[in-house]
């Protein structure tokens, strides 16, 4: 994939720069990946830029420029790396089911999602649910660590469901996981 599809206003020299994948966790970085340096609740991604570069990141997206810029590494400064990652993941995994219903609230999310899932299934619709119980669908079962997963994971799951011709998804959206 090439950068110009995802970032506007790049210098011409960088428009055709390619990448193999992207992550916000430096431990998951592989050769020629993009690293999104995100401020989390416990960690600041900017503190892991060097680790990401050592692991193979060649493009860094951050809200700060790192001093002592490494040769061969492109830095892209954005005001909100988390929002940039969400937009990036949404474009990268651009094919998703047509009908996505999100359920949020203090109590009852799992029950409501399960009810919707059963109703659609009884009506012979190809349906999946995502939430506390993981990902559930015809022939698809996947455990998840959190009720609401990160933006890369949710986009990847939705794209995979679309590949399996599932057009209806009901998901739990915890208020903590929304952005």
Positions of PLM-derived features:
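N-terminal leader/targeting and accessory segments in enzymes
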Residues: 1-87
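Phosphate-binding loop of NTP-binding sites
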Residues: 83-179
């Amino acid at each position: 994939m090439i950068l110009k599809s995802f970032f506007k206003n790049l210098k011409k020299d960088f428009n055709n720069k390619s990448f193999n994948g992207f992550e916000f966790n430096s431990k998951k970085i592989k050769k020629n990946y993009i690293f999104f340096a995100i401020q989390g609740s416990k960690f600041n991604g900017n503190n892991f830029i060097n680790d990401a570069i050592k692991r193979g990141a060649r493009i860094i997206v951050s809200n700060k420029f790192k001093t002592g810029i490494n040769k061969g590494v492109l830095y892209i400064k954005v005001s909100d790396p988390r929002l940039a990652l969400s937009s990036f993941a949404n474009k990268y995994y651009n094919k998703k089911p047509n009908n996505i219903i999100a359920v949020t609230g203090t109590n009852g999310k799992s029950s409501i999602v399960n009810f919707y899932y059963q109703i659609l299934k009884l009506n012979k619709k190809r349906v999946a649910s995502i939430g506390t119980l993981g990902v559930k669908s015809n022939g698809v079962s996947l455990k998840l660590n959190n009720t609401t997963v990160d933006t890369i994971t949710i986009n990847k799951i939705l794209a995979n469901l679309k590949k399996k011709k599932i057009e209806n998804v009901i998901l739990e959206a915890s208020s903590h996981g929304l952005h």
